[in-house]
Design a protein with these regions (language model features):
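Membrane-embedded alpha-helical bundles that constitute the cytochrome b-like, heme-associated redox core
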Residues: 1-132
């Protein structure tokens, strides 16, 4: 297993893994945007799986820090906003991947929500890393 030796109890390692997943998400998102519709199944699958992995890892990191040190109100609030940004990113990405006549606002939202997700995730991880 590639990540067999990764100490997932280390918040720092989780932060680095989340950053790596974001690099994969953005790289394949960029490639998808460049390739245009219809989207490559391979590129879309990698993009989606990396997104799901990032969400799961971030959730597990929040859970771990909450169970071991407790979360501050600020960390919980930023975490909730991060979750909402992820939901917006996934929803707009899902609409785009369906194809057909998609309103331009959906494309615009899918350019904004991933950036918002990254900024909020970075803030979340900074707060979590200072806690853990």
């Amino acid at each position: 297993m590639i990540l067999g030796n990764l100490d997932v109890s280390s918040v720092t390692n989780r932060v680095m893994a989340t950053g790596a997943l974001y690099a994969v998400i953005f790289t394949f998102g960029f490639l998808l945007a460049r390739s245009g519709s219809p989207y490559s199944t391979l590129l879309l699958t990698i993009h989606k799986l990396a997104s799901v992995a990032a969400v799961i890892l971030l959730y597990k990191t929040f859970t771990y820090v909450n169970q071991t040190q407790g979360l501050s109100v600020l960390a919980m609030a930023v975490g909730a906003l991060t979750g909402l940004a992820f939901i917006g990113t996934v929803a707009t990405g899902g609409l785009i991947s369906i194809g057909g006549q998609i309103p331009e606002i959906v494309y615009l939202a899918h350019r904004v929500t991933p950036v918002l997700s990254v900024v909020l995730t970075a803030a979340s991880l900074l707060l979590l890393n200072s806690s853990g």
